[in-house]
């Protein structure tokens, strides 16, 4: 580690946030004399602070309004950072964001979009989570896409903007409001339009868990409140909201661990992440990725949603498909057919599942004990119980229990 490296690191440590023009001038005055030694900071063994260095210098120029120098520094730096590693997602996303803002200030919308389109690839990098024994449920209407997914062991995705709740993703109402308010600021408008175009390319699929899953390591370690472990397919609201009023079906998945992850060769990222539920979402100047795409109103908290987020650079497909692998029986644990599913649709589902006789297929019906509850009956395949697929025990009142005992004692049927 050279003396110059140490000096640069000390300067960066003292200037992690550039608040104003005065600080920007001071930072550049300190760092520019070391320009011959900037590449020394690319040394991974020494600590690899090169990304922080490039971000700081480019931000300094941006704060001063010197957008051309900011672009030059950021472009030269990001080429080296990409060359050094396929990772460092936070640094790369931050530098591409600077490029997007500065190109917008220079009036170059095409280059602004090109830079900002790199951000959606890096933002979900560190969000991947996996629960090897957890069941995830997908409620579907019967359609070409849903039957194709069931047949091919795939998951088709769609834009979050097409979900049933118009504020399901905070990003779209947030950016539309920003565009309305910044309509007279040409540079800001270019930047926001580029953001909307780039981040509008995210695709997603919603799954439902049997319990609220931890959002981070701290939550995973903390003691959690007890809850009734009732599988989602017993929830009449889920069928009504997401399965065409009980006319569709529900698939119980065990998502393989290698599905979620990053493919650096094709620049594709698939992330699995629980939704965070909040009381409100005030408008503010900036949104984090989690706030924009992985946060919903507490009114939806009963769903225990886990969202699959997909992005691939250069892929503009409306409904891309993610494969769950070749082991069908490992990926799909069970299929549940809605109580109002048309007979011809049920026949199509059963025809697909004949190729996988070990997987149970159930038909849902109104419970014999409670009109407001659902039951399942096995109509194909073999029963393969998991912790999450055991039907909840029906609680009966004291009088009913006594009456049953009396009926049994006198031999009535």
Predicted regions and their residues:
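"A position-specific structural signal for the A-helix of alpha-solenoid helical repeats
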Residues: 10, 49, 56, 91-94, ...
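Specific register positions within alpha-helical solenoid repeats of the TPR/Sel1-like families, i.e.
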Residues: 12-19, 62, 104
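Alpha-solenoid helical repeat scaffolds
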Residues: 29-32, 75, 79-82, 117
């Amino acid at each position: 580690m050279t003396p110059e490296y140490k000096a640069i690191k000390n300067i960066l440590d003292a200037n992690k946030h550039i608040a104003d023009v005065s600080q920007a001038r001071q930072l550049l005055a300190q760092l520019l004399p070391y320009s011959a030694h900037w590449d020394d900071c690319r040394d991974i063994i020494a600590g690899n602070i090169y990304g922080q260095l490039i971000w700081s210098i480019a931000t300094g120029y941006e704060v001063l309004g010197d957008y051309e120098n900011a672009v030059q520094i950021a472009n030269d730096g990001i080429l080296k950072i990409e060359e050094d590693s396929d990772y460092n997602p936070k640094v790369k996303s931050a530098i591409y964001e600077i490029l997007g803002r500065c190109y917008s200030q220079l009036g170059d919308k095409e280059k602004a979009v090109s830079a900002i389109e790199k951000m959606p690839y890096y933002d979900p990098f560190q969000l991947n989570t996996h629960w090897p024994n957890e069941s995830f449920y997908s409620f579907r209407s019967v359609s070409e896409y849903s039957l194709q997914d069931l047949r091919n062991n795939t998951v088709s995705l769609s834009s979050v903007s097409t979900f049933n709740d118009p504020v399901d993703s905070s990003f779209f109402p947030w950016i539309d409001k920003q565009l309305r308010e910044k309509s007279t600021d040409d540079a800001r408008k270019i930047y926001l339009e580029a953001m909307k175009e780039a981040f509008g390319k995210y695709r997603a699929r919603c799954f439902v868990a049997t319990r609220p899953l931890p959002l981070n390591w701290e939550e995973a370690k903390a003691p959690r409140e007890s809850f009734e472990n009732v599988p989602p397919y017993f929830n009449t609201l889920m069928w009504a909201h997401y399965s065409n009023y009980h006319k569709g079906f529900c698939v119980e998945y065990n998502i393989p661990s290698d599905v979620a992850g990053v493919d650096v060769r094709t620049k594709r990222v698939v992330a699995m992440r629980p939704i965070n539920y909040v009381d409100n979402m005030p408008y503010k100047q900036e949104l984090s990725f989690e706030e924009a795409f992985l946060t919903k109103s507490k009114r939806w908290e009963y769903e225990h949603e886990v969202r699959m987020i997909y992005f691939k650079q250069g892929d503009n497909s409306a409904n891309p498909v993610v494969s769950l692998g070749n082991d069908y029986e490992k990926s799909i644990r069970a299929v549940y057919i809605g109580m109002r599913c048309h007979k011809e649709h049920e026949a199509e589902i059963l025809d697909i599942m004949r190729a996988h006789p070990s997987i149970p297929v159930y038909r849902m019906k109104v419970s014999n004990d409670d009109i407001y509850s659902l039951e399942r009956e096995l109509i194909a395949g073999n029963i393969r119980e998991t912790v999450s697929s055991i039907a909840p025990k029906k609680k009966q009142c004291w009088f009913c229990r006594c009456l049953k005992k009396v009926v049994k004692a006198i031999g009535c049927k």
